[in-house]
Amino acid sequence: MIQQMRARRAGVIVNVTSSVTLAPMPLAAAYTASKQAIEGFTGSLAHELGAFGARAKLVEPGYGPTTRFADNLGLSVADMIPEPYADFARPIFEAFANPPMITREGDVAEAVWLAANDPSDRLHYPAGPDAVALAKAG
């Protein structure tokens, strides 16, 4: 695919990561590391493709409880917390039960569309009001 993008001197790759890359968050170290790897890869790729008129972009969605993302695990995230961390984790899970801002599916779709159609060299597209707030704070 990259060979064709170089030959046409056009094209865009949009990778979707997470707002965990915008600010350190507790209880998400491994998940954050996996998303940061994609961010680093995409940032480097953007430089490489840019020399050929193609682009790479990142969409960073916020917390989306309506996506049922955690249901894909097949078990409760709270049940995965080791006992020594239970007291530390409790208020974090309580805060996630009633977040002040969330990301909806439409927020992500809009950010992907914007990233795919933006001819600039902008790399980051936070998706959802919570992700936008984190990006501005960072």
PLM-predicted stretches and their roles:
Residues 51-122:
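SDR active-site lid
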Residues 34:
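Active-site helix of classical SDR
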Residues 23-30:
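Active-site loop immediately N-terminal to the catalytic Tyr-X3-Lys motif
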Residues 3, 47-48:
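Alpha-helical segment proximal to the catalytic Tyr-Lys
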Residues 123-134:
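Short-chain dehydrogenase/reductase
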Residues 18:
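Residue(s) in the substrate-gating loop at a strand-loop-helix junction
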Residues 1-9:
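A short helix-coil junction within the Rossmann-fold of NAD(P)-dependent oxidoreductases
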